């Protein structure tokens, strides 16, 4: 769980912005979205292979 401490004389907006940035860097939101619905292992493998194919074509 991401946790920040509000600094002295820091506005709530700035603290919220820091918290959101910290969550984005740690990948919490993307992990939650990934786990929102069950995905069969075969579907995971298929998506992984397609992503590898896309990445290979970029380079």
UniProtKB/Swiss-Prot annotation:
It comes from the Bacteria. One of its GO terms (biological process) is translation. One of its GO terms (molecular function) is structural constituent of ribosome. InterPro entries: Ribosomal_bS21 (IPR001911), Ribosomal_bS21_CS (IPR018278), Ribosomal_bS21_sf (IPR038380). Pfam families: Ribosomal_S21. Transmembrane segments: none annotated. Residues 43-59 have a biased composition (Basic residues). Keywords: Ribonucleoprotein, Ribosomal protein. One of its GO terms (cellular component) is ribosome. Residues 36-59 are annotated as: Disordered. Belongs to the bacterial ribosomal protein bS21 family. This is Small ribosomal subunit protein bS21. It comes from Alkaliphilus oremlandii (strain OhILAs) (Clostridium oremlandii (strain OhILAs)).
């Amino acid at each position: 769980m991401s946790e920040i401490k509000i600094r002295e004389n820091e506005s709530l907006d700035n603290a919220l912005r820091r918290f959101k940035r910290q969550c984005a860097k740690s990948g919490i939101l993307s992990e939650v979205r990934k786990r929102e619905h069950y995905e069969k292992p075969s579907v995971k493998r298929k998506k992984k292979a397609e992503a590898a194919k896309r990445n290979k074509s970029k380079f």
